Swiss-Prot record:
<keyword id="KW-0235">DNA replication</keyword>
<dbReference type="InterPro" id="IPR038454">
    <property type="entry name" value="DnaA_N_sf"/>
</dbReference>
<dbReference type="Pfam" id="PF08299">
    <property type="entry name" value="Bac_DnaA_C"/>
</dbReference>
<feature type="binding site">
    <location>
        <position position="192"/>
    </location>
    <ligand>
        <name>ATP</name>
    </ligand>
</feature>
<dbReference type="InterPro" id="IPR013159">
    <property type="entry name" value="DnaA_C"/>
</dbReference>
<dbReference type="InterPro" id="IPR003593">
    <property type="entry name" value="AAA+_ATPase"/>
</dbReference>
<feature type="region of interest" description="Domain II">
    <location>
        <begin position="71"/>
        <end position="141"/>
    </location>
</feature>
<dbReference type="InterPro" id="IPR024633">
    <property type="entry name" value="DnaA_N_dom"/>
</dbReference>
<protein>
    <recommendedName>
        <fullName>Chromosomal replication initiator protein DnaA</fullName>
    </recommendedName>
</protein>
<dbReference type="GO" id="GO:0016887">
    <property type="term" value="F:ATP hydrolysis activity"/>
</dbReference>
<keyword id="KW-0238">DNA-binding</keyword>
<dbReference type="GO" id="GO:0005524">
    <property type="term" value="F:ATP binding"/>
</dbReference>
<keyword id="KW-0067">ATP-binding</keyword>
<dbReference type="GO" id="GO:0006275">
    <property type="term" value="P:regulation of DNA replication"/>
</dbReference>
<feature type="region of interest" description="Domain IV, binds dsDNA">
    <location>
        <begin position="365"/>
        <end position="487"/>
    </location>
</feature>
<dbReference type="GO" id="GO:0008289">
    <property type="term" value="F:lipid binding"/>
</dbReference>
<keyword id="KW-0547">Nucleotide-binding</keyword>
Length: 487
């Protein structure tokens, strides 16, 4: 296998999947390091960029490499400074998924770094999306100007979350009933877009609030470097003097000391009526690695789930992407037949739709007459081969809760009323029947219960079903609803 040819093909496919802006921001400095019989290693200039790619893009990178060479079993990301001397120019490079901003009167200035040097210039493709105007020192990755409420596709699955987000951006501290706002959803369903839209709108509001937007990973990195540099107090003072904290990917917040500091910050902001917005890939009560005090405080506000987009939303996303592509190339055209087909076929998330569109846009340059059959062939990795998606415990909880007119939070709570206990036991039973999860893991997903509680619930529902035809029909109906949800 020609290594250079492999990397060129891989890079082209990766750019088609993630889009040119994302590629320029996160993968422009990715280099092929070594290729052995079963392991491919890439290098990046910083530890943080390695962590970012590992957490967000490793599955995609691995699948693309394996599609080029099926013998590859493993893909690794290394830091170049760990494998060879770092040149001076490289030591200034940083890739940090964060935007920190604070607004002075009519001048949107950014809160400067407390413990790090300024980052190197952003790639040209990324510069096009930076906030323009009278901004002060820029630190880390800027807010993406494309992520606004106007560009967010609204539908039945995200309407409540969007309404809450707009209320916070417009009302600020007046939106106390949404404090903290916790948005949870699977990968690619719009959490980051919505959080950045809140930050963008807040900065542009006449209230001139001081806003900090960051990821949980970046929060950990900033505190670690501040502690290392004996500058933690300065960082804490900076964060305490803000009006709006927006933090993404809360599921990645790790470490006892870091969580302790975050808990203090969260308590201080909420007690001072400062707005906090958090997003994660699961509900706050399912974040088992979080300190119970943090989890409890996050549960004290408004938790809203964003579900997968329906057909109308998917079609609108593709239409908007088409409009954006035509701004760059007025002659660009993909037939409505193909757009409709893709909207019906690629159903998992907006991110997969974006990948599908980028793939079609890339292919169109040398295959101008794409047919529906050819599109199916190109997007087979997104459309799937007819296999059902893995059932998630949170899907079971949501469907059971809806069926019995209770909330998911009640299912995982300590309440033991009859109206809650029966649905909870049925949900535990279905979790054991429909997922590969163990009794202890199911117990953790139901509010940290012991595995014996789950075992008791499973045995009890089995016994009841054998003598209660009505309950048996209810459970079969729930199974069908869950399987249809994952079809």
């Amino acid at each position: 296998m020609m290594h250079d040819a492999l990397f060129e093909r891989f890079s082209a496919r990766l750019k088609a999947q993630v889009g040119p802006e994302v590629y320029a921001s996160w993968f422009a400095r990715l280099k092929l390091h070594t290729v052995s019989k079963s392991v491919v290693r890439f290098t990046v200039p910083t530890t943080f960029l390695k962590s970012w790619i590992n957490n967000r893009y490793m599955d995609l990178i691995t699948s693309l490499v394996q599609s080029e060479d099926p013998d590859v079993l493993k893909v690794e990301i290394l830091v170049r400074s760990a494998s060879r001397p770092v040149r001076p120019a490289q030591t200034e490079e940083r890739a940090q998924p964060v935007q920190e901003v604070g607004a002075a009167p009519r001048n949107k200035s950014f809160i400067p770094s407390q413990s790090a040097t300024a980052p190197a210039a952003q790639p040209m493709a990324a510069q096009a999306t930076l906030r323009q105007g009278g901004s002060g020192p820029l630190f880390g990755s800027p807010l993406d100007t494309r992520f606004t409420f106007d560009t967010f596709v609204e539908g039945s699955s995200n309407r409540v979350a969007l309404a809450a987000a707009k209320t916070i951006a417009e009302a600020g501290a007046g939106a106390v009933r949404f404090n903290p706002l916790f948005i949870h959803a699977g990968v690619g369903l719009g959490k980051t877009h919505l959080l950045q839209a809140i930050a963008n709108a807040a900065i542009d509001s006449p209230r001139n609030p001081r806003v900090v937007y960051l990821t949980a990973e970046y929060f950990m990195w900033r505190f670690a470097t501040a502690i290392r540099d004996n500058d933690a107090l300065t960082l804490k003072d900076t964060l305490r003097n803000i009006d709006l904290l927006v933090i993404d990917d809360m599921q990645f917040l790790q470490g006892k000391m870091i969580q302790h500091e975050f808990c203090h910050l969260l308590n201080m902001l909420l007690d001072s009526a400062k707005q906090v917005v958090v997003a994660a890939d699961r509900a706050p009560w399912e974040l088992e690695s979080l300190d119970p005090r943090v989890r409890s405080r996050l549960q004290g506000g408004m938790a809203i789930e964003i579900e997968g987009p329906d057909y109308d939303m998917r079609y609108e996303m593709l239409n908007r992407r088409m409009g954006s592509a035509r701004q760059d190339d007025p002659s660009f055209e993909i037939s409505d037949e193909i757009l409709t087909h893709v909207a019906k076929s690629v159903t998992a998330s907006g991110r997969e739709l974006e990948g599908a569109f980028n793939q079609l846009m890339f292919r169109r340059s040398f295959e101008p007459n794409l047919s529906v059959d050819r599109v199916d062939e190109l997007l087979s990795h997104l459309v799937g081969s007819g296999e059902a998606k893995r059932v998630r415990i949170e899907d079971i909880q949501r469907i059971v809760a809806r069926h019995y007119n209770v909330s998911r939070q009640e299912l995982v709570s300590n309440r033991r009323t009859r109206v809650i206990v029966k649905p909870r036991q049925i949900a535990m039973y279905l979790a054991k029947m429909l997922t590969p999860r163990s009794f202890p893991e199911i117990g953790r997903r139901f509010g940290g219960r012991d595995h014996t509680t789950v075992l008791h619930a499973v045995r009890k529902i089995e016994d009841l079903i054998s003598g209660d035809t009505k309950l048996g029909h209810e459970v079969e109906l729930l199974k069908r609803l869950i399987n249809e949800n994952n079809a």
